[in-house]
Amino acid sequence: MKAILYVIVAVIALILGGAAGVAGGYYWFERESRKKLNSAEARARHIVDEALREAEAKKKEAILEAKEEVHRLRTEAERELKERRAELQRLERRVLQKEEQLDRKVEQLERKEETLSRKERELDRKNQQAQELVNKQMAELERISQLTMEEARELFLKQVEQEARADAAKLIREIDAEARENAEKRARELVGLAVQRVAADHSSELTVTVVSLPNDEMKGRIIGREGRNIRTLETLTGVDLIIDDTPEAVVLSAFDPVRREVAKIALQKLIQDGRIHPARIEEMVEKAQKEVEARIREEGDAACFELGIHNLHPELVKLLGRLKFRTSYGQNVLKHSIEVAHLAGIMAAELGVNVEVAKRAGLLHDIGKAVDHEIEGSHVAIGVSLLRRYKEHPDVIHAMECHHGDVEPRSVEAHLVAAADAISAARPGARRETLETYIKRLEKLEALADSFDGVDKSYAIQAGREIRVMVKPEKIDDYAALKLTKEIARKIEEELEYPGQIRVVVVRETRAVEYAR
C-alpha cells in the first residue's frame, strides 16, 4: 500500500516538476524570444537608418552629378554657339567681301562700257571726218586735174593702197618683234629654270685607262714568258696593253669603254692575286665580265630610280647601263641622258604637258648609242627599233626620234626633248672639241654668210653661237635686211650641224659725210 502511495506521490511530484519545468522553459523561451525580437527590431531600425543615410548620400551625389552634367552641357552648348557665331561672322565677312568685289567689278564694267561708248562715238566722228575729207579731196582732185570721178577714185585707191601696205609692213615688223621678244623671254626663263635646277658634272672621258702597278717588276709578269700572258689578256678583252717606260703603270687602250673596264678590273684582280698565267687570266676576265654586267644593271636601275621612271623593260635598263661606258665628244652618254631627262621633265612641268613622256623620252633618246658599234645605222634609227621591239609608248618613240630633226615633231614633248638635248650638249664644259674642228666650224659659218649677195663682212662671235653680218647699204635696204636674216638662218639650218642655236644678226649702216670748209 505504501509502495503504491510512493508511486502516486512520485508521479504527482514528477507531474508537478514537469509542469514547473514547462512553465520555467516557457518563461525562458518567451524571454529569449523577446530579446531576439528586440535585437532584430534594433538591427532593422539600424539598417533602415543606414539605408536612409545611404539613400540621402546617393541622392545628393546624383543631384551633384546632374548639376555637373547640366554645367558641362551648358558649357558645350555655349562653346558651340560661340563657334557658330564666329563662323557666321566669317561667312558674313566673306559675303561682304564678295559684295564689295562684285560692286567693284560692276563699277569697272560700267567704266569700260562708258569708255567703249565714248570710243565708239569718237570713232563715228572720225569716220565722218574721214569721209568728209575723202569727199573734199576727191572734189579737189577732180577740180585740179580735171579727172573724172572714176579716174580720181582709182588714183585715190592706189594712194591708199600704198599707205596701207607701208602701215601693214610696219605693223608686221612690230608684231614680229614683240612675238620674238616674248617668245625669247619665256624660253630664256624656261631654260634658265631648267638649267639651274639640274646639277651636272663636267666631262673628261678618254679612250685610255691607266692601271697602277705596285712595282716595275710586275710589268714582266704581265707580259709573261714569250708574251703569252699579255697576248691572252688582249685576246680575251679586245684591249691593247701598252707597256712602256712609264714607271709603275700600264696603259689600256680601246675604243669600247666596256672592254676597257673589263680589262682594268681583270688586271687589277690579277695584280692583287699575284698569280698571272693564261688559265688565271681567263678566270679573272670572266669574273670581271660578270662584275661589269652587274654594274651595268645597277647603273641602269640607278638612273631609272633617280628619275622616278618605272616599268622600263629589263633589256632597256641594261642598255642604259651600257651608256655609262660610252662617251660623245668626251661627254658621258648616260649622264647626258639623265641630264636631258631632268631638263625635259622640268620644262614639261612648267608648260603643263606630259612630264612622264618627256622624262622617259629624254632618258632613252640616245639608247641606240649603246649598240651602234654592233648594228649598222644611225643611233636614232637603232633606238627607234629598240623602243618598238620592247613595246615603248608611241609618244615616247616619237619624241625620241625627233631629237636630231630627222622627223618633224608633232608634240610639245618632242620639241622639249630636242631642246633639252641641245642644252645639255651646249652647256659650258659638257663636251670637248679640238681647236682645229672648232676653227673650221667658225670659218664654215662665216663663209656661208659671205656667200649671200650684198654681204660686206661677217663675223662669228660668242664661240660660234652668233653670226654678225655687215651688209652694203646701197644694195640691201631695211626690208631686204629682214629677208636676208631669215635666208641666212634657213641656210645654216640646212647645211651646218651645230649644238643649240645660232643667232643671226644683220647690221645695215648708212653714213653721210660732208666737210665744212
Curated annotation (Swiss-Prot):
Q: Which Gene3D superfamilies match?
A: Hypothetical protein af1432, K Homology domain, type 1
Key words of the record = Cell membrane, Endonuclease, Hydrolase, Membrane, Nuclease, RNA-binding, Transmembrane, Transmembrane helix
Q: Could you tell me what this protein is called?
A: Ribonuclease Y
Glycosyltransferase found in the keyword field: no
Q: Where in the cell is it found?
A: Cell membrane
GO MF annotation list? RNA binding; RNA endonuclease activity
Q: Which family does it belong to?
A: Belongs to the RNase Y family.
Role summary: Endoribonuclease that initiates mRNA decay.
An annotated GO BP: mRNA catabolic process
Q: Does the keyword Oxidoreductase apply?
A: no
Database matches in InterPro entries: HD/PDEase_dom, HD_domain, HDIG_dom, KH_dom, KH_dom_type_1, KH_dom_type_1_sf, Ribonuclease_Y, RNase_Y_N
GO CC annotation terms, alphabetical: plasma membrane
Query: What EC number(s) does its UniProt record assign?
Result: 3.1.-.-
Top-level taxon: Bacteria
Q: Which organism is it from?
A: Symbiobacterium thermophilum (strain DSM 24528 / JCM 14929 / IAM 14863 / T)
For membrane topology, the record states: Single-pass membrane protein
Query: Can you give the residue ranges of the HD domain?
Result: 333-426
User: What enzyme category does the UniProt record give?
Assistant: hydrolase
Can you give the residue ranges of the KH domain?
207-292
Primary location group: membrane
